[in-house]
Structure formats: structure tokens, C-alpha cells
């Protein structure tokens, strides 16, 4: 409830949904807590289902959805309250390349459509993350070792030695 008060949406690395409920039931369950007006709630849910191309799976139980569909469901759940801050924990974890590409497009589109939303992503897949962010921090042992634009981070000697290694060499 505190997150709702401060307009924060959270996308966990794993889970974050009710396995035995359908995609639609998951959205309705969370929507009832976040959006009191039934008409607005139904409109928001319908809009998110359409926007995330989940129309054809809305009656399927969450446990039977693909990894990408589940991740989209959890993003939709996080967006129900129109957050000002969206926290994403390891959003690309355990997903195939095509699904990662799809999620990157979703995040970029979300930022473009809502320029005031701040999307914070904790992610180990540097190449994937740096291709879509404006700014990044690299942490090591709970300390910031480098920060800046993706281009600057790739060139940063401390970031190279402690995190990237030869990862970005041609």
C-alpha cells in the first residue's frame, strides 16, 4: 500500500502473480486494490491487455503462460496504478533472446509514451540493458564503481576492469 501512495510500480524477478488465476483475474485482483472506480478499473485493464497484446491469453491461468507472457502480466499489474517510478528487478532473467527484445521494445515505448515515468532496472545483462537506457550505475560490493551514459560506461576503465572485462571489445 505504501508503494501505491508514492506511485511506485514493482516488477519482481520471479513471480508477482497468482499462479492459479487467469491473466484477467490477476489484473482484476490487483486492480480492485488500486483502482476503486469499477469503470475506470475495467478500462485500464482492457487498455493494458490490448497494449501488451495479451487479448488471446487473458483467460489462461498464469501458470500456463509463457515466460514472456508472465513478465508482460507482471508489468501490466505494476502499471495499473499509473506509477511515477517503475522498479524492475532482473527483468530479462531466464528469458530467450526474442522475448528480451520484445521486453526492451515495451520498456522503450513505455518511456516514450510516458516521459515523466522513471524506470529503474536492476539487471546483470549489461549489453541488453545498456542498449535501452539513458544512464546507468555499476555497483560492486554495494558501492557505485561507475556511472554515466552507456557510451561513457563502456569506456570507463574501472567499469571494464571490475565488470565488463573484454565484453565490449570489437
Which ranges hold each PLM region?
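Catalytic Walker B motif of ABC-type/P-loop ATPase nucleotide-binding domains
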Residues: 86-89
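ABC ATPase NBD coupling module
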Residues: 1-9, 14, 153-157
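Conserved ABC ATPase "signature" region
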Residues: 39-57, 108
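Hydrophobic anchor residue at the start of the ABC signature
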Residues: 75
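Q-loop/switch helix immediately C-terminal to the Walker
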Residues: 14, 21-32
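Conserved ABC ATPase signature
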Residues: 61-65
Amino acid at each position: 500500500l505504501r508503494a501505491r501512495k508514492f506511485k511506485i510500480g514493482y516488477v519482481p524477478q520471479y513471480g508477482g502473480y497468482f499462479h492459479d488465476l487467469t491473466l484477467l483475474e490477476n489484473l482484476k485482483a490487483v486492480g480492485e486494490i488500486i483502482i476503486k472506480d469499477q469503470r475506470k478499473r475495467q478500462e485500464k485493464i482492457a487498455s493494458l491487455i490490448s497494449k501488451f497484446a495479451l487479448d488471446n491469453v487473458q483467460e489462461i491461468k498464469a501458470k500456463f503462460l509463457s515466460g514472456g507472457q508472465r513478465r508482460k502480466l507482471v508489468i501490466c499489474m505494476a502499471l495499473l496504478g499509473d506509477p511515477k517510478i517503475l522498479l524492475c528487478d532482473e527483468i530479462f532473467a531466464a528469458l530467450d533472446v526474442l522475448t528480451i527484445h520484445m521486453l526492451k521494445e515495451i520498456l522503450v515505448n513505455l518511456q516514450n509514451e510516458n516521459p515523466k515515468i522513471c524506470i529503474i532496472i536492476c539487471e546483470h545483462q549489461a549489453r541488453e540493458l545498456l542498449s535501452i537506457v539513458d544512464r546507468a550505475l555499476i555497483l560492486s560490493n554495494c558501492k557505485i564503481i561507475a556511472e554515466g551514459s552507456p557510451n561513457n560506461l563502456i569506456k570507463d576503465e574501472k567499469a571494464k576492469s571490475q565488470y565488463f572485462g573484454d565484453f565490449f571489445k570489437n
